[in-house]
Amino acid sequence: MAAATFWFVLRGWRTGVPPGCGLRRLSQTQGTPDYPRFLESVDEYRFVERLLPPTSIPKPPKHEHYPTPCGWQPPRDPPPNLPYFVRRSRMHNIPVYRDITHGNRQMTVIRKVEGDIWALQKDVEDFLSPLLGKTPITQVNEVTGTLRIKGYFDQQLKAWLLEKGF
């Protein structure tokens, strides 16, 4: 008890406030602080908008002839009448990718498949069989909408999907 009293007295001595005086009462007696005034300007917000990332990917511009110099081609306006659909990526490219796992397992992945993915697998096997001389090994994932093909066939499959109208 004596130690607690000693600390209260010492605290009052350090802060210059007697031990019984409430700090809340002292802070309320002072007036509200005068904050500096500010001016709200909306004219300069256009400079801030240039720094913010866009909220959505813009639509690709229209060109006179396709394919463009970089090789990009838009999908056909009426989508192909097939039981499956391969949706473009967010940058408007065909979602066919190369994948390598375990150091040397080379795979080609077709993503964003909607509809009957098994029909796409059969069409891909029919397309790649003459190129390979045998039926390619494929893996279908219905939940994620992906089709994996053993080997690198990304360029051939991109051209084939463009020809189909995706």
From Swiss-Prot:
GO MF entries: structural constituent of ribosome
Question: Is Transcription given among the entry's keywords?
Answer: no
Which InterPro entries does the UniProt record give?
Ribosomal_mL49
GO-annotated biological processes = translation
**Chain coiled-coil ranges:** none
Chief site of localization? mitochondrion
Subunit annotation: Component of the mitochondrial ribosome large subunit (39S) which comprises a 16S rRNA and about 50 distinct proteins. Interacts with OXA1L.
- In Swiss-Prot or TrEMBL terms, this protein is called Large ribosomal subunit protein mL49
